[in-house]
Amino acid sequence: IQAALDANDSSETDRLVLKITPGDYREKITVTKPGVTFANADVTAKRAVTIRASYYSSNTFDADGKFVPQDEFDLGTNKCATVTIGAGATGFSAYGITFQNDYNVVDHTAAGEQTPAVALNTQADKVYLKNSRIIGRQDTLYVQGAGNRVYVDGGYIEGTVDFVFGDANAYFAGTELHMAAFAGKNNGYFTAANTKKSGVGLVFDRCNLTVAAAYDDDAKLSLGRPWQTFAQYTQVRKGDGSSYVTGVDLGTKNSAYTDTSSAVTYLDSTMSSKITKNRWNVWTSKNQSGKSVDVTFHDDVRFAEYASHDETGALLDPADYKNVVLGSMSALDEAQVQAKRAELLAALGFGSAAGQWVVPDGAWPFAYDPNYSTGTDVQPTQPGGNASPNADSAAMPETGSAIIAVVVVAVPLLVAGLALVAVRRNRQQ
């Protein structure tokens, strides 16, 4: 896939559509050009196109606070994503694609091994994802870049800790957010926004928040916590790079993050009964004795929940939730829900007015082909690469011999041994 990207130019008005045959693609990909589309050749998406790799962040630092990689796969949170949509890749879209980071999902799954491992990092404006799956554990989907707009249309996102995070303005319509289980863990956070004060943040509309059966009734699962909306605190960094908090002034904003104001909104969404009654969590750090200390600047946190309902469809009554942490919980009637939805979409910059983004209509970028819509899932045929150090090789997924069709006028190309047919499509208006 990376070779196909490198061999073809594109723009927002002369799009490059990669029509990808179902199968596993084990590679780390960076999209740098505007107007690129990844599309599953099976329009029904019953057979998966899975892009997978296994890189991570150990969050290891030296005494000066400099990141210290532990091996060649330890790239840090900003660089470990399986697929990165770079800042110049305006207008990227994906249809029926699975983005997966195998770290902590397929390999390194033992208790104590959970660590950030991003599956998809979007750094561009006007990113559109249709019926796609994003799979990881901690830090699965990173929507990055203040003012950037991301629209997630349906699909599925899976993780355990902060698995939708970042400072972009992102709207999720009818998406399932699944809290996966991890060995030795009985807690998790759906989101970790570090929205700027001018941003709207993460908006989840008519979404379904589900939780793995492995979590018991004592699980501490929250809708999110406020990344970088910190109060002023002091800390000591030890020789091994670890640090601990020595003091916190909750009434003063942290001078390093004066413009951060974490914002997350849930609207008309279905909530698992296993989500905490407190709904949200503060951000904490450890003190010298190992106790968690609240370091959140509460006044700048913008968490809201509107018209949530349980698995049966019954509306949740805010009166039953007396100790909501940080955010607000409101009951709305249908007219109020519609008004709030319109308000949020306009604030996010979606629409047809000047300066707004006309979001794609969701139609697949090419016609239905029954040849890609029958039979069972593609079976991998060749051993995969990029196994993480100490990974169980027997558990590593394999790579199928799949074909990419690049949707320039039916001209066959050959890139990196893959048959390519390029077709251009103008930008959707």
Give residue spans per PLM region.
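Alpha-helical transmembrane segments of integral membrane proteins
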Residues: 402-408
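Sequence-level preference for short, compositionally simple segments enriched
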Residues: 1-378
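C-terminal membrane-anchoring or membrane-association module
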Residues: 408-429
